Amino acid sequence: MNMIKKNKKKSFLCTIFSTINVLHGLIAISPIYIIKESFVNNLGFKIDKLAIFGILSIIFWTLFFIIFLKYLILIVSINNSGEGGILTLMSITAKKINSKSTFVIVILGLISMCLFFGDIIIIPSISIISVIEEISIYYLSFEKFIFIISIAIFTFLFFIQKKIKNEFNNIFSFLISIWFILVGLIGLKGIYINPEILLAINPKYLINFFKHYKLNAFFVFGTLILLISISEILYINIGRFSKLEIRKSWLFFVFPMIMINCFGQGSIILLYPESISHPFFFLVPDWARFFTFTFAIIISIISSQNIISSIFYLTRQAVRLGYLPNIKIFYTSEVKSRRIYIPCINWIFYLSAVIQISIFKNLHNLILIYGIGSIITMSLTTFFSLLFFKKKFEKFKILKITFLLTILILEFFIFISNSYKIICGGWFPIVFGIIFFTIMITWKVETFNLLLHTHNNSNSIKLFIKNLRKNNLLKVNGTSVFMSSMDNTIPLSIIHNIKHNKVLHEKIIFLNIKTEDSPFIKKECRVEIEKLNNGFWGVKAYYGFKETPDIKEIFHFCNLLGISLNIMETSFFISHESLILGKRPWYLAIRAKLFIFLKRNSLGSTYQYSIPLDRVIALGIQVKI
């Protein structure tokens, strides 16, 4: 019996430990700034029991209702084979509603994702600057070097991204677990001094706060958005853990530690109002302060690294779903494909971080520019979830819809309370999001138009093969593969090959690689083959958006299904379109020029599908768009 209890205890601790870095490391540094920043917005909040108890009550119930009930109970149940995130939710919702509304859902999903991108690139700056500014309060000489130190840390952080392997996750999880325990212990000191602070859990203090400060009270959410928006990144990463593991680690470890610390800070501010500028480190004993500063910097780097990893993952997902051009993606771990590194995204975000710090300079200004994109994304997540549950027949349907409607109303007020940030610098992430959206929609629309343009005169494959018999073309030994982007259409590469070379191989494969909405495709459903006439074969390979197509794997399944193929005896014919700008209105001409630029800088099928370079024959085709 004792052995069973020990195993259960060990299992519980392992659950917390395994999720702590990936899911909750992002929120780890927030106790340093969340309380003090709630008071510095010049909204007339007095440093008294009413304000302190009220703000603590708001933090507690907001985290409970939005992060725990909304996300960890309801939203995580809406997933695609365990995968979450706004793109996944968009895809699931689009399937549930009528086709006329699908376009609107997709556009809203893309807009929210891009705006969220614009916001989350600010979080690393906030995490790192918050710690350095706290250090400068105790070590005044640091104040002159905040900018230089921040840039140095960012340079180090972005430089090591390619070196970080999945195996480091255990080290990061251990450090963040220790940090959360330390955060809780620091808070306990304040609670011990004034235990009455725990009464702030009572929602009556929240109500009294809103009664007294009226509309101004909502502006507290301008700071709290930093805490609650982390739930969107948590939703993106749910695929690596079970729902029960995520709920346990939040409810029994992370949430209590954060709230204990917040209550401790509230207690010390009530007793020593002068500590409002640095309540977190005010609770730390003098002898432990240097260690805590050092540890906090390390945690801020790990927290920032998690943000960057989430950005890499979202980018790869967008690439695989066809919303971004093919770009170089490196897998830094042989064990799990989630640990990836994307050089161009890494350095774009590094440049963005440098610009942020250069323009906005301090923590308060950085917090002022954060929140618009996040709350829009959170509201759309709620809206999409409402549509999902409305179409789904299940238990407690009415209760779920009522709860989500209530949350949507609350999020509307949070949006209003953050809207003033647009004139305070909030335009920065919005502009970034608009640029990102423009790139995504341009690539998706123009790629589709290009496919239509290059295939609109094509006959069906079977008719094409039938007509080839009349030409009596010379046949040579070996196998040729022609990449096809659309079903039942003739690849341009074979048309140009026949036109210029006037020969065909004995075995000809029309290969169509499809990316499905699911994260993974079962191995037994990976490849479908169709035997056509005259030595022609049709092959369709299916991959999930989390998987990377591999020509060797496709050939392996083809061999199992009856086509004898050898990569080193196969020639791959790939079309290389040279795009020329045709006559268009000026606004469409700008979009076309952007597409031409993206197309020229995107990677071709050779890299995308790991095709051996010495087996590739590229055929240049000039296309007017």
Curated annotation (Swiss-Prot):
GO MF term list: potassium ion transmembrane transporter activity; symporter activity
GO cellular component, one term: plasma membrane
Recorded superkingdom: Bacteria
Listed Pfam families: K_trans (PF02705), K_trans_C (PF22776)
InterPro entries assigned to the protein according to its UniProt record, in alphabetical order: K+_transporter, K_trans_C, K_trans_N, Kup
TM ranges: 15-35, 58-78, 103-123, 140-160, 171-191, 218-238, 251-271, 282-302, 340-360, 366-386, 396-416, 422-442
Subcellular location: Cell membrane
Catalyzed chemical reaction(s): K(+)(in) + H(+)(in) = K(+)(out) + H(+)(out)
Annotated membrane topology: Multi-pass membrane protein
Key words, A-Z: Cell membrane, Ion transport, Membrane, Potassium, Potassium transport, Symport, Transmembrane, Transmembrane helix, Transport
PANTHER family, alphabetized: LOW AFFINITY POTASSIUM TRANSPORT SYSTEM PROTEIN KUP (PTHR30540:SF79), OSMOTIC STRESS POTASSIUM TRANSPORTER (PTHR30540)
Record function comment: Responsible for the low-affinity transport of potassium into the cell. Likely operates as a K(+):H(+) symporter.
Family as reported in the entry's similarity comment: Belongs to the HAK/KUP transporter (TC 2.A.72) family.
This protein's name: Low affinity potassium transport system protein Kup
Organism: Wigglesworthia glossinidia brevipalpis
Lineage: Bacteria, Pseudomonadati, Pseudomonadota, Gammaproteobacteria, Enterobacterales
